[in-house]
Each structure stands twice: as C-alpha cells, then as structure tokens.
Amino acid sequence: MDTEGFGELLQQAEQLAAETEGISELPHVERNLQEIQQAGERLRSRTLTRTSQETADVKASVLLGSRGLDISHISQRLESLSAATTFEPLEPVKDTDIQGFLKNEKDNALLSAIEESRKRTFGMAEEYHRESMLVEWEQVKQRILHTLLASGEDALDFTQESEPSYISDAGPPGRSSLDSIEMAYARQIYIYNEKIVNGHLQPNLLDLCASVTELDDKNISDMWAMVKQMTDVLLVPATDALKSRNSVEVRMEFVRQALGYLEQSYKNYTLVTVFGNLHQAQLGGVPGTYQLVRSFLNIKLPAPLPGLQDGEVEGHPVWALIYYCMRCGDLLAASQVVNRAQHQLGEFKTWFQEYMNSKDRRLSPATENKLRLHYRRALRNNTDPYKRAVYCIIGRCDVTDNQSEVADKTEDYLWLKLNQVCFDDDGTSSPQDRLTLSQFQKQLLEDYGESHFTVNQQPFLYFQVLFLTAQFEAAIAFLFRMERLRCHAVHVALVLFELKLLLKSSGQSAQLLSHEPGDPPCMRRLNFVRLLMLYTRKFESTDPREALQYFYFLRDEKDSQGENMFLRCVSELVIESREFDMILGKLENDGSRKPGVIDKFTSDTKPIINKVASVAENKGLFEEAAKLYDLAKNADKVLELMNKLLSPIVPQISAPQSNKERLKNMALSIAERYRAQGISANKFVDSTFYLLLDLITFFDEYHSGHIDRAFDIIDRLKLVPLNQESVEERVAAFRNFSDEIRHNLSEVLLATMNILFTQFKRLKGTSPSSATRPQRVIEDRDSQLRSQARALITFAGMIPYRTSGDTNARLVQMEVLMN
C-alpha cells in the first residue's frame, strides 16, 4: 500500500515537472545545495512550531488532568469570556426611550464610579509607595550622615590626619569604652539627671562639668571659666533661642562678658609676670591695678621706646600706663593716670570721664564725632602706638587698623576689636569707623578661618576666638572634630542646651554645623541630636547605662517624622546592646515586672517598651520582640509573634538545648501564665497559639514512638478527618485556619497516615484469632483503618491548599499498601 502511494506521488511530480518545462514564458530556476538547505530549515521550523504547540497542549492536559481539571472545558470557558459587553460603547437611544435612557445613565454612573475608584486606588498606592520610599531614604541618610567625620567641606577632606574615626572598635566584652575624663563627665551627668527626675531643684550643670577638669590641664580649666563667663547673661523673653540670641541686649551682654573675661585673664597674666620677676618689677605702694601695671611696665618696657608722647608718670609713658590699666579692665586706675597727666592731654580728660561714666562705654554722638575728627587730623599717623590704640578704643574709630604694635597677641586683638564693636546704627559713621559684631564674626570665621590660627597646634585658641565672639555653635563643632577634645565639646553643648542658649538645627538630617535660610548671615546652627548620637556611639554597646543618661537630654526633641528622639535612641540602644533586662526590666515568674534603668526616667514605660519591641520585630528579631511585648502586657502581639516562631518548628524532632526545645518551653511558660492570670488575646490568634502547642505535643509523642497517644491527640484536635462522613466538615473548617497551621498540614497528614499504617501492620502481625480477639473484630478494625486512610486521601485532594507532590505520592503509596 505504501509502495503504491509513493509511486503515485512520484508520477505526479514528474508530470508537474514536465508541465513546468513546457511553459517557455517562465524562467528556469536552479537552486544550489545551500539554498535547498535553507528552504528545508524554514519548512522544518514551521512544522516544529505547530508540533511544539501541540506537545505543550498535551503536557498541559496531562498536568491539569491529574488534578481533576478538564482542559478542553477550561478553554471553552475562556473563549466564551468577553469584555465587549462590559466596556463596549453604549448604544444611542431615542429621546422618547425612557427605559433605554435610564439604563444608559445607570451604566454610565457605574463605569464612572469604577474608573474613579481605579484612579483613586492607583493614586493612593503611588502615594503610599512614595511616602515609604521617603521614610526609608531618610533613615538611610541618617545612617550615612552619622558616619561622616565633620560638617561642610571638612566632611570630604581626605588629608592625612592622626585623629581616629568617630566609630572606634569596641573593646572586649565587659570593658568600658570610656576613658577616665569621659567617665568623670558621665558621673556628673548622672548626678544632674538624678536631681531632675527626682523633682529636686535643678542643679547647675556648668558647675558639675567644670568640676571634672584635670588639675594639671590649664586649657580645660580656662575653657570652663570662659564658658561660665559667657553664659552668665540675662536672656530677654523670646519664643526661641534665635530671637533671644539675636536681640541687641543679649549681643551687647555677650560682648561685655567677653571683654570682662579677657581683661581678667590679662590681669592674672600681669600678676603672674610680676610675682615671677619681683626684683625687676619693684612692686610697692598702695595695692591696686595702678601699682600692678607700673611694676609690669618695669618688666615689659625697661627702657623708654622712641616715639612715645606726652611725657611720663612715675617714670613710665603716660599712654602705656593708660592702655594697660584699661587692658586690665580698671578704668579708675586709668583715670588716675589721666588726672596726673591732664595738663599734657588736652581735651582727652573730658572725653575719658564721659566714656568711663557712660552705661555702655560709649560717647555721645557729638563727642564721638569730635574725637574722631581730632584722631583723623592729628593722630592717625602718630608715632605713639599706645595713644592711637586708646583713642581708637574710646572713639571706636579706624577699625581697619589692627594696632599690631600694641595688640601683638590674639587675645589683645580680640579685646581691641570687641571694644570697637558698635550696635546702634545712627548712619553718621563712615565705614572705617564702624564695626558690627556680625562683621567681626564673619571676619574671624570665614575670612581668617582655621588656617590662620594654626588650629592643629593651638586648638583652644581658635575655640576661644569663636566662643568669645558668641559663635558658640561653630566653636563646639570645631572642638568636636578633635578626638581627644570631643568629650569637652559635647558637655559645653549640653550646658548651652540646658541654658536655652544653643541654636539647634531644625532637622536631624542637617550637617553638624549649618546655616539655615532666614537666619542672620553670621548665625550657625548645631545639629545637637547628631552630636550627641555620634558621641554616645563610641560607648553605647559597652556602657549602655551611661548612654541612656545622655539620651535623656533628647526627651523633648522630635525627628522629621514627629517621633520622640529619646524613645528612638533608647530603642536603638537596646537593640544594639541587647541589654533588654537591664534597661527595660525583666518579667518575673509570677508575671510581675522587675524595673529596669528606664524606670528612673519615666513612670509609664509601656510606650518605650512597645517602641523597642516594634523595632526588634521590624528587624526580624521575633523572639526578643515577643519577650518585650510580653513585658509591655501586649498579649495580642506576643501570641502573634509566638505563632510565627512556633510554626516552622512544629514537626521537628525535640532535642535538649535545641531551638525547638527553647521556643516550646517559652511558649508553655506564656500559656501557663496567661491561663493562670486569665489573660486572653484576639480569639483567632489565641486559638492558633494553643493549636500549635497541641500539634507540638502530637509530634513529640509521634517521634517518641507513642503512636496510640499521638493518634488520640490528633483525633481530639479535629484537624483532619478520620472517617468519610467528616471529610467535608473538615475541608470547610480548614478555610478558617491561619497560615501557621496550614504550613504544617503536609507533615500532619504524613504523620497521621504513618500512624494508621503502623497500626495496620501491627494488626496484620497479630495471630489470626484468639479467644479475646475474634476474627470479626480484627476484620472490623482492618476495615476501619482503611476507611480512615481513604478519608485522609480524600481530604488531601479537596482542601484548597497546594501540598507537595512528594506528600501526595507518599500518602497514596501507604494507602495502597494498606489495600
């Protein structure tokens, strides 16, 4: 038959070739072997495409058919579905067709509502996604910023420095990361907070911190003396620190305090110099500033300098005596010199008396203009540097002249310029006779800067320059960048913060030192929260108690999301140090809570514990989170997390000190305590928790070989059917179980089937019949076991849950072996 078919096909091909050759109009095409191969490949690919589609259909039929699904029926249903009737354009209706009009209006309203709901849903999803991204990015920014070494350009300065990073390696466990000075500061902070939380009178934090200074470190002692002097001001009532700090009264007070500090320091310097050279100083006469300055000049100016004018008083130049008396802050002593030499000084005595008796050391405008005119005409190029300096101070003129012959040290330069600072803008002063505090601050911070003051060799000098010009934030930020001086900078910031003198950044993502829009040009803000968190990061893992004391200063601060910074820092501290019991307290066996360190700072600890528990939960630390929620009496969250922890370990074999044994004991302890105290949680979560405990007991009995006890447990739980009549009931009940129960279904089914199969083998292994067990009883039991196995198979096939193919195969295999 096949031979005849091929012969007929050959005959037709030859006939077709003959007919084609007979047509002369058509050109004759000859193909080479490569072209024939390509054409064959094209035909083959078409055939394979059709064949592969058919093969895929066959495979789909086999796969779905094994689950009881008819693929042809599904295909027909899918083809019959059409969206045309739902979204097709509405048919036009006549004006008089009321029914059609109403139907169209109804359909239009439905479609509009659906479209509006769709747009609103997508919009809400986009908004939620955007907010989530912003919050996450804000957290990432915080972590990045907290690792930067400094603010501004210094943050990206890669020059070699000997200073270590903020984040130093933690020492061995149990060893403090605080050095002796830092520990001494921490003790004073503890004393301060103890007074605050106990409701006592607020102590002076500045005095507490100043008591820490090392006896042999004069720089630190001088620093705290300067801080005490500069903060001893009366603040004007204002809504915030910026308005208070920017008021004219407070700025004038800062300048007065700075001058007082510089004058007292210089007087102390002259005392030390004189008493160190008593023979040369020839100290004598009535004790006081005048005699002190006279003796000091015996050392400083042993021989008269050329160019000094207006004679001498007791062998010393007049203007030098006046200048150094003023430099020591004693205008009465300077007045004494003026009175002795009044005949050589002309009108100066009158001007000096007015200057000395004025409230703000300021001449009247008329007198000031007269003195300035005299200075410009007769004294600008005078050869006596002391005379020029005194006139520039009293008349506040020629501010561009630094008087370097007299003010040869930084402290002298500061004193001279602060004396020339003016606050009232009468509009009559020329630029060379006017120096504002803002101009002077800008000159020191931006024009001169750190490079001018050789900060690596003299860090305290630059700190002093900034602090005495009321640039507290810039001074603190500078000192904080030096590892060995960081603790001092932090505690100066704490003192200013408590005195309401610190200008804080409005957001925690700002640099350590920043300038915000709307602030005066010379004003800088300090990121106080970041400063404190960077400082505590060094020791929070080894000294969490001390870190907590510092975080208490943030109790009224909030982050960009409005979250309390004290709560946030405590939660991060607890997670980082894992000192849950010590900081937050511990739950005793009777359910009472043993107080922790946090109880000293607040009477209501639940919000803090719940916050820490939430952070632990978000980090995946479910076991710690469950304990913390238990500490906060949040039963719903405790059982919810315990369900997540218990679900994976339910079918595991128990072993001493294993993960399952630990979690089981923890769960049993919670269950016993909740039942004894009558604590209940959400009904669904509660029932899941106790069902998981029962399943753990079931598997423990099963793995121990106590199959009869295990069978009794699974029978009482009513989780799987053990007869055909209860299959549908169990399938319906299965829909109400949580995922924690469903995930263990495969193991429960296999264990139950194994129990039935073991009982079946044991039944078959007994003698055929006996007086106590007749043959009929054995047959009934055999039938019952097979029926129970069949019920399990039916249940596994009907539940709306995908079990593994291996589970189904093993279930079927054991059921077949029983038959």
Swiss-Prot record:
Q: Which terms are listed as keywords in the entry?
A: Membrane, mRNA transport, Nuclear pore complex, Nucleus, Phosphoprotein, Protein transport, Translocation, Transport
**A GO biological process held by the record:** poly(A)+ mRNA export from nucleus
Keyword Glycoprotein listed: no
Task: Give any GO molecular function from the UniProt entry.
Answer: structural constituent of nuclear pore
Protein family: Belongs to the nucleoporin interacting component (NIC) family.
What does the record note on quaternary structure?
Answer: Part of the nuclear pore complex (NPC). Component of the p62 complex, a complex composed of NUP62 and NUP54. Forms a complex with NUP35, NUP155, NUP205 and lamin B; the interaction with NUP35 is direct. Does not interact with TPR. Interacts with SMAD4 and IPO7; translocates SMAD4 to the nucleus through the NPC upon BMP7 stimulation resulting in activation of SMAD4 signaling.
Q: Which residues carry this modification: Phosphothreonine?
A: T49
Report which residue ranges the record marks as coiled coil.
none
Which species is the source of this protein?
Bos taurus
Q: Give the membrane topology.
A: Peripheral membrane protein
One GO CC annotation, please? Answer: nuclear pore
Q: What does this protein do?
A: Plays a role in the nuclear pore complex (NPC) assembly and/or maintenance. May anchor nucleoporins, but not NUP153 and TPR, to the NPC. During renal development, regulates podocyte migration and proliferation through SMAD4 signaling.
Which residues are reported to carry the modification Phosphoserine? Answer: S52, S66, S72, S75, S80, S430, S767
Task: Report what the protein is called.
Answer: Nuclear pore complex protein Nup93
Q: What subcellular compartments does it reside in?
A: Nucleus membrane; Nucleus, Nuclear pore complex; Nucleus envelope
Where does it primarily localize? nucleus
